[in-house]
């Protein structure tokens, strides 16, 4: 971030600060944070990056890690949840700004940056979220007053700042929600801002041992790059072999993750009842060679969607560390032997389960981000040779 990037911030002007005042304070404080905190994922230094990006609805930083691994530098982040902010700070050395719907928060966004990244809240559009809201008589999709309109704040930021590109993520059901009308509105809104729009549903199971289909949307500024520009999803490098869940399972796991007799009996009875009715609801056990079901934010409640069998014992939940690895985050000693480059979990188990259940498959976002980075460098006439990765293990 530089002084020129914050000249437009009205909140700073209201406080009597100049852009240079803010820039000097920001740089000094940020360097102190990096030096004192010794965070595992600080990202490239200013001036050494290939592109800049902002991280909206940042969660625990799945987009940030992925884009930093492609030599991008984050110049703004926003996340409303205080527990996710804590995890974000522990790993990246920055506390994200809060509610992105507030003008004061938006005023801190640099005037210029290259890519807008955002995995905007999926509950209004997910199958599980919609089903629950319907059963409770609540609105869903764009009619959800709390979360359904958050996309339009993204559109507003794109319209005001005109980044070179956007990179968005949401649930698979976004494409079919409300008979396709929701997706149509998103597409037409972004195209109406003179951006290209390409989207694809991709399963994270090619990168991690988890079935997790998500909708990815990428677009370029057509005013800058012309009408023919578009994102090349076919250039994404997909691993030759899918990983299995045995690669992320720990041994000698704390007994607290083993299901109680009462909970295990309840899950078995619940599954039996629904099986007799012809429904598919129930718990999901895994084998070392298998791929798990989709990890959800409700995993902390009973762990039923992903249970690990144990000889002579009730099955157990995944540990938070295993959940981190299941989403592709490097965490010692499961998928990295570098203690200094291991994801930090500074919150309770329940909060960690929610955070990883809400997160993205980081290596998949990294793979898409690599193509996006290369296209931007090519469009801007810069060298597209890949630099050494800062890197997370895939």
Label the model's feature ranges.
Residues 1-28, 33, 39-40, 262-394:
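C-terminal target-recognition/interaction regions appended to catalytic cores
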Residues 18-162, 172-176, 181:
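Core alpha/beta nucleotide-donor-binding catalytic domains of modification enzymes
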Residues 106-113, 127-294, 298-300:
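Class I S-adenosyl-L-methionine
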Residues 122, 126, 223, 301, ...:
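Active-site/binding-pocket entry motifs
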